Amino acid sequence: MANDPSHRVVIVGGGAGGLELAAKLGRKHGPQCVTLVDSRPMHIWKPSLHEAAAGTLDIYQEGLSYLMLANLCGFTFALGELQAVDRARRVVTVDEVLDGHGDMVLPPRELPYDTLVLALGSVSNFFNTPGAAEHAVTLDTTDNAEQFRLTMLKAMVQVDQAKVRDPSARLDVVIVGGGATGVELAVELHEAGGIVAAYGLPNFRADRDLAITLVEGAPRILAALPEKISRAAHTRLTELGIRVETDCRVAEVAARSIKTADGREFAAGLCMWAAGIQGLPLMAQLDMPLNRIGQLVVNGRLESPDPHILALGDCCAVPRGENGTVPARAQAAHQEASYLVRKVTARIRGTAEPQAPYEYRDHGSLVSLGQDAGVGSLMGRLAGRGLFVSGTLARVMYMSLHLMHHHAVLGTWRTATLALARLLMRRTHPRVKLH
């Protein structure tokens, strides 16, 4: 059936779900119907930001240009941050874009829509912890990851120099939050520290001079995953010399330390906050229902109270069961994008929309425990049980998740070419970004 070229779809947010939706709709309906808005010029798969923070992934090599993707996949890309949504006029305002010198590259723009899809993601939730916003780094964006990487590299160089006059000098890193991001970052930092030491830091030894502490408020790390996965990850962290503190709630973050609710204090030359999410402040401007952490409340068909506004991913709360919500995970965003392709296509073609609600399917969880190990549970629950995997197999399967995302956007041949190019590049570059 023919498209209605006058039906304008604007997708705000080029994360995993938003980009997959734009790519699939663009291939079907073309750039005259589909526009993707994002505040950054490059796409990075967010689950890999912990590798960017450790320096084991170079965001400038791994990033995909939105303009390139728009050309390949048939959508229009608008660079800029979402400033406002005028629901009455059905228009979004995209903020101006400035260069590094503060000169304007693009002015503010208004983009009209018939269907608006919010895929804004989430930001870190500090839970009103004193000092956290001022002294802790997050992994919300590639800029955050790059800031942490540079700060970490500088701190290791300083410790290397300080060892000459003070043999006890060391770098203390505290990671708040024992979910997948916190666990993966802890292992990645440990491995990166050992690699960096081999590149011109003769006095620095990661096993001696890099102290990593993972702090988790729940009784165990990876509390949302099966206990067997949690135990395996805890064992791996302990074997690497990473200190794990569970049942430990952070009461305050200072410039060089954190204080816990039970009165303890941990040295923290660097503090990474990975302990929860919340919706972006902009969500409050929509004048629609939000949940307690600022996510837009949608129904099972991913519809907001405004029939022209849909949502997917971490920015919204999707009902699951009687009282639950769909977890904020990459696989959920992928599934929601696939659901919305059918729904939005029906709108563009003027046909009946599917009435069956979106149903989240848990295909399991994989956690990276370094460059050669992982742990996870596959296929959700088979006959009431998950299939436990660990070691190199789990790591290979974890890496395949990134390729699956690229495949959804780029297709088979381009994904294979990209994977080969990155493999060859890693043979000629250091394993950790050093500049």
Predicted regions and their residues:
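FAD-binding core/adjacent interface of flavoenzyme oxidoreductases
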Residues: M1-S6, F75-D172, M272
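Rossmann-like NAD(P)H-binding beta-loop-alpha module
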Residues: F148-D207
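Conserved N-terminal Rossmann-fold NAD(P)-binding element of oxidoreductases
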Residues: V12-G13, L118, V176-G177
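C-terminal, flexible cofactor-proximal segment of oxidoreductases
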Residues: S6, H29, V341-H435
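Short glycine-enriched, charge-decorated loop/helix-capping segments at active-site entrances
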Residues: L49-L57, A133-V137, I229, D287-P289, ...
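A Rossmann-like FAD-binding core segment of flavoenzymes
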Residues: P31, C73, F77-E96, H190-G300, ...
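FAD-site-proximal beta/loop scaffold in flavoenzymes
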Residues: E134-K163, R256-K259, E265-S338, R342
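Beta1-alpha1 glycine-rich phosphate/pyrophosphate-binding loop at the start
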Residues: A2-A84, V183-L225, M272, V396
